[in-house]
Amino acid sequence: MTQEGKLEQQFLDYLHSERNYSVNTSTAYENDLLDFRRFLNEQAIETYQQVTFLDVRIYLTELKQKSFSRTTVARKISSLRSFYTFLLRENVIAENPFTYVSHAKNQLRLPKFFYSEEMEALFQVVYEDNETLTLRDRVLLEVLYGTGIRVSECAGILLPDLDTSYQAILIRGKGNKERYVPFGVYAEDAITDYLPKRTELMTRYKKSHDALLVNHYGDPLTTRGIRYCLTKIISKASLTRKIHPHMLRHTFATDLLNNGADMRTVQELLGHASLASTQIYTHVTKEHLKSTYMKHHPRA
């Protein structure tokens, strides 16, 4: 059995043993995987790790040309997204090329981002006072927006990871890949103001660890804890539309591209294994430009 065949079998075993899927459902998943592997062979793509977002778009086009029903296409994409989510969980791949594919309409599902006035409202919340947890939230927001790192990566930052002389942070990303990301003066000032308060809090509760971000008991702030803190900040800012913390990462990438950053640099900063994962943000900026034009130009 090939390595790709082994991965498929591991996934099918997972569906049967952990998800309790029926034989018929597992068979449908297996057929969808086989169909996709035939496509990869035709494209001379040897491994599942080599698949990019653009390959997925080509596959979707092929399914459409074969006149599959919308329901069938939706099922196939759902099967493959689940398979790649499994590979991601098993650290076989670093990025899921099916993440931003909307199977319902065979269109791009564009990442949502914060508008400038929304970012201003968020920052107003974390600069309203200099209490310990407010300073912690200030670091949280400045670092997430200023570096574009994932929430899970932010939770993993240790004090030795901070290189203040170069204004950079060592980040451990997906698949335990390490990268350095720069941070600006706002994040640096926020960290400088926060660290003495962090020390006081940890001393009070007799805690000893290197995690940069701590909760109100001085323990390391978990990924779940960060999401909770961000949700509270968003709530205090009285933002009305549906918002999630990962939008800070989307906003980081979108703002860089809108201000002239090149794609390769943004890819490296985000820690994307494939450039195709970063190219999604060019669609966001184009949509934003179009909507701004349609809204403000007198002859739009």
Swiss-Prot record:
Family label: Belongs to the 'phage' integrase family. XerC subfamily.
GO cellular component, one term: cytoplasm
A GO MF label: DNA binding
Record's subunit section: Forms a cyclic heterotetrameric complex composed of two molecules of XerC and two molecules of XerD.
Extent of the signal sequence: none
PROSITE patterns in the record: CB, TYR_RECOMBINASE
Annotated GO biological process: cell division; chromosome segregation; DNA transposition
Active-site residue numbers: R150, K174, H246, R249, H272, Y281
Protein name (database record): Tyrosine recombinase XerC
Xref: CDD domains: INT_XerDC_C
Compartments reported by the entry: Cytoplasm
Organism: Listeria monocytogenes serotype 4a (strain HCC23)
Pfam families attached to this UniProt entry: Phage_int_SAM_1, Phage_integrase
Main location per the UniProt record: cytoplasm
Function: Site-specific tyrosine recombinase, which acts by catalyzing the cutting and rejoining of the recombining DNA molecules. The XerC-XerD complex is essential to convert dimers of the bacterial chromosome into monomers to permit their segregation at cell division. It also contributes to the segregational stability of plasmids.
Superkingdom of this protein's organism: Bacteria
Organism classification: Bacteria, Bacillati, Bacillota, Bacilli, Bacillales
Domain Tyr recombinase: 109-294
